[in-house]
Amino acid sequence: MSRVAKAPVVIPAGVEVKLNGQVISIKGKNGELTRTIHEAVDVQHADNQLSFAPREGHANGWALAGTTRALLNGMVIGVTDGFTKKLQLVGVGYRAAVKGNVVNLSLGFSHPIDHQLPAGITAECPSQTEIVLKGADKQIIGQVAADLRAYRRPEPYKGKGVRYADEVVRTKEAKKK
């Protein structure tokens, strides 16, 4: 039995929730997010709270209810406060710039990299070696950050590459003669 699913999600003021069958839509100051809920989960909306319970006949109903609760809680946080992800560029000549919804990266290749940002995601560069991604959808923020990191992952000898701001890169010792 899921302990996560037993805790209700509190809906703050200024957030509008629409439940239409198995499709839930949450709207706030940062936009609107929509998700389809698994048929094994029953969601009730009352008193500015979302409560979750499994439906009969599904073996993994409590597990899916806990997962659904965590996803919808992330949606509520996203439309109220939003999510941020910070990336750092470590290496000589590694630079980033943002023009509109395109991130321009110079990562030591013979060509610059232009990465198109999806709708709902904004990026800014406080310095040439930092990228800050902002948006309401936690999953898309993480995917964009992973895509940018995949262009030049941190290598284990000098640590050069694109890394998350909170990432610790374990460096290896160079080969001895």
Curated annotation (Swiss-Prot):
Record carries keyword DNA repair: no
Matching Pfam families: Ribosomal_L6 (PF00347)
GO molecular function: rRNA binding; structural constituent of ribosome
InterPro entries to which the protein is assigned, alphabetical: Ribosomal_uL6-like, Ribosomal_uL6-like_a/b-dom_sf, Ribosomal_uL6_a/b-dom, Ribosomal_uL6_bac-type, Ribosomal_uL6_CS
Annotated PROSITE patterns: RIBOSOMAL_L6_1
GO CC aspect terms: cytosolic large ribosomal subunit
Keywords, sorted A to Z: Ribonucleoprotein, Ribosomal protein, RNA-binding, rRNA-binding
One of the GO BP terms on file: cytoplasmic translation
Listed Gene3D superfamilies: Ribosomal protein L6, alpha-beta domain
Annotated disulfide bonds: none
Family per record: Belongs to the universal ribosomal protein uL6 family.
Function (record text): This protein binds to the 23S rRNA, and is important in its secondary structure. It is located near the subunit interface in the base of the L7/L12 stalk, and near the tRNA binding site of the peptidyltransferase center.
Self-association state and partner proteins as the record states: Part of the 50S ribosomal subunit.
Protein known as: Large ribosomal subunit protein uL6
